[in-house]
């Protein structure tokens, strides 16, 4: 089993993701520069948070054209696992690997705080060790985290059980007040139709040690590792 963390110019959460896979998941992991095109030795890749290409034009819009992204698409099409965190989620949407888009936060300013998300499904490689309805405390840090999609896309996501995380209160209730950025239907994370691609705006890699305020994100990575182990 081997993980890769893709590094774009402007990525700043790549070392956090590397640390989690190495220390808390206990698996080999490499940094993958955005100009690389060979992902054949990896079982799962992570597109980390940050500001790829300075978020010029809009978040993820330039990164989608990096040489590595054609390989990421083929990687996902082959059934292997792709996790996009924050800026990584934005890039996955821009690249067409996930539906919808991430736009400016409702209040038009950068948000950096701990929030709560509810696990909406345990039927995914990233949540199969979590229980549906479980509440996780995970930080967010973004200016463009407002998830939008049209009515048909939302209906499809709901029908196919592809909404993986939703913003919630600490007791798990879904409210407008718990929605930090205006995301439609309080959506915090979604997966692809094949369920092997996940994008989420919260930062689980920053919630893997109690010293940092929460270890709730650790089981997301451990779920993925268990799924990869069963697949290889």
What function would you assign to each model-found segment?
Residues 50-51, 88, 143, 204:
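Active-site metal-binding loops of divalent metal-dependent hydrolases
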Residues 73-77, 102-232:
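Amide-donor transfer/coupling interface in amidating biosynthetic enzymes
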Residues 1-85, 93-99, 105-111, 118, ...:
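N-terminal beta1-alpha1 cap of cysteine-dependent amidohydrolase-like domains
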Residues 88-89, 123:
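Short, flexible active-site-adjacent loop segments at beta-strand->alpha-helix junctions, enriched
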């Amino acid at each position: 089993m081997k993980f890769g963390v893709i590094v774009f110019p402007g990525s700043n959460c790549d070392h956090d993701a590397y640390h989690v896979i190495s220390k808390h998941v206990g698996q080999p992991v490499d940094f993958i520069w955005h100009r690389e095109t060979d992902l054949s030795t990896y079982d799962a890749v992570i597109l980390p948070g940050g500001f790829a290409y300075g978020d010029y034009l809009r978040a993820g819009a330039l990164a989608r054209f990096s040489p590595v992204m054609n390989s990421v698409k083929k990687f996902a099409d082959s059934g292997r696992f792709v996790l996009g965190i924050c800026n990584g989620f934005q890039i996955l949407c821009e690249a067409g690997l996930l539906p919808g888009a991430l736009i400016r936060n409702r209040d038009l300013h950068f948000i950096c705080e701990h929030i709560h998300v509810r696990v909406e499904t345990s039927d995914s490689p990233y949540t199969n060790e979590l229980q549906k309805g479980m509440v996780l405390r995970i930080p967010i840090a973004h200016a463009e985290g407002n998830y939008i999609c049209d009515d048909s896309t939302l209906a499809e996501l709901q029908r196919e059980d592809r909404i993986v995380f939703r913003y919630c209160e600490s007791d798990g209730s879904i409210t407008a007040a718990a929605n930090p950025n205006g995301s439609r239907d309080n959506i915090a994370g979604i997966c692809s139709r094949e369920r092997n691609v996940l994008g989420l705006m919260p930062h689980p890699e920053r919630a893997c040690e109690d010293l940092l305020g929460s270890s709730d994100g650790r089981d997301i990575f451990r779920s993925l590792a268990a799924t990869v182990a069963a697949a290889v």
